[in-house]
A protein has these predicted regions:
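Conserved CoA-thioester-binding segment of acyl-CoA-metabolizing enzymes
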Residues: 1-51
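Terminal peptide-recognition signature
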Residues: 15, 31-32, 50, 63, ...
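Hydrophobic/aromatic residues within transmembrane alpha-helices
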Residues: 50, 115-116, 174, 194
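Glycine- (often His-adjacent) and acidic-residue-rich active-site loop
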Residues: 52-88
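Glycine-rich beta-to-alpha active-site loop
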Residues: 85-137
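Well-ordered beta-strand positions
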Residues: 121, 161, 165-167, 182
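C-terminal long alpha-helix characteristic of the crotonase
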Residues: 124-125, 175-226
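Hydrophobic, secondary-structure "cap" segments at the distal end of domains
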Residues: 147-157
Length: 241
């Protein structure tokens, strides 16, 4: 069974994550990266929406059990590959030549929230789900590249509160700070609002892509500098005290 699928609604592509909590591992990163390439090859696509079909979750972030299992086996390469491939996904989303919208239908934690920040716009349900950066509670600080682009989506004074407390935020709270475009009443409102908004964004790929390259030039440099070589030790990303 696929972990994500995509369909077209007129000129809007909709990626739907279909793997429950949609935990992110190497398979997730490779699948999403390939799907982004497949979608953008369709010249009729003018916008992209990313969402989930799970009743509770958008994405619960990194597949920690998968990472811990590989670390216990001293099998660092798949995890290193995942981190680099996920950074590649972030770069693709940042530079995607059509607008990218996250339709957050449920919990977005850790890398799930971070991925939504790589998108251009965010919509979220008011009746279900929290948005949270729990890294401070599990001993995994944001990587440099993540910090570089999350700041485009969240004002720094709010981001510092979110990172340092690990608190959970609702859609109305995010809307208040313009982190999301709209706090939607329910699932139907979420998708209707995101799709209607996406269909207003009939922009030429050339100019939009160039604007993104210039706007995020410094961010991409930081992401590139974050590349993990094969010799990197994954446990160096975690802090115990």
């Amino acid at each position: 069974m696929p972990i994500m699928t995509w369909i077209k609604d007129e000129t809007v592509a909709i990626i739907t994550m279909t793997n429950g909590e949609n935990r992110q591992n190497l398979e997730f990163a490779k699948t999403l990266s390939a799907m982004l390439d497949e979608i953008i090859a369709d010249k009729s696509i003018s916008a992209l929406i990313i969402t989930s079909n799970d009743e509770k979750n958008f994405s619960q972030g990194i597949d920690v059990l998968w990472i811990m299992d590989n670390m216990q086996k001293n099998n660092h390469q798949p995890v290193t590959d995942f981190i680099n491939e996920m950074d590649n996904v972030f770069k693709k989303l940042l530079l995607y030549p059509v607008p990218v919208i996250a339709a957050i239908n449920g919990h977005a934690f850790g890398n799930g929230s971070i991925m939504s920040c790589a998108c251009d716009f965010r919509f979220m349900r008011s009746d279900r789900g929290f948005f949270c950066f729990p890294e401070v509670n599990i001993g995994i600080p944001f990587r440099w590249g993540m910090n570089a682009f999350v700041k485009k989506a969240i004002p720094l004074h709010i981001l510092s509160q979110m990172q340092f407390t690990g608190n959970r935020y609702t859609a109305p709270e995010l809307e208040k700070h313009n982190i999301i475009v709209k706090a939607c009443a329910n699932q139907e409102d979420l998708m209707a609002s995101a799709i209607a908004f996406a269909k207003t964004l009939q922009k030429k790929r050339g100019i939009l892509g160039e604007m993104k390259k210039r706007l995020y030039n410094d961010v991409i440099k930081v992401l590139d500098a974050d590349f993990m070589p094969p010799s990197a030790k994954i446990d160096s990303l975690m802090m115990s005290d």
